Amino acid sequence: AVYTALLRFLPIEMQVTYSVDGTPLDTLPENYCDHYVPEGFVLDESSELRDSYQFFRSYHSADDRIYFIDCVTINDSFISTFDNEHTVWQETNVNDCPATLGTTNIQGHVSYALIWEKDGIYHSILGELSLTDLYLVAESIS
């Protein structure tokens, strides 16, 4: 299948809409998940969600930082939205895949949103972790 992303930058949100030409992926590969956890972060097992087409995890640290990982098989008209009012967006890459990085700085608290598509799977990582750790987490997902 061919997956096409349309990014729309609206006044208060950034919207990602996918269209699919062909038969979309219907299940995640077996054991598909992140394989790197930054030092000081712990998986919140109570919030973990996993089924055949999605996995969601959140991690927290002792100093109250948190980040979320969401990976979902893309179907036609899949939509995801993000804050655009306080976020600066730029193009980047994750494992040679085009990606979009959002940086939010509110009163000195910096957080990131990193989104990309690979092999019919939508990936997003949101939260308060270093930029280096953000990319290490992203590159570990398989």
Where are these regions (language model features)?
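Membrane-interface helical sensory segment of bacterial ECF anti-sigma factor regulators
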Residues: A1-T17
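Short, solvent-exposed recognition patches
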Residues: D21-A113, E117-K118
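Surface-exposed amphipathic alpha-helical segments
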Residues: D119, I125-S142
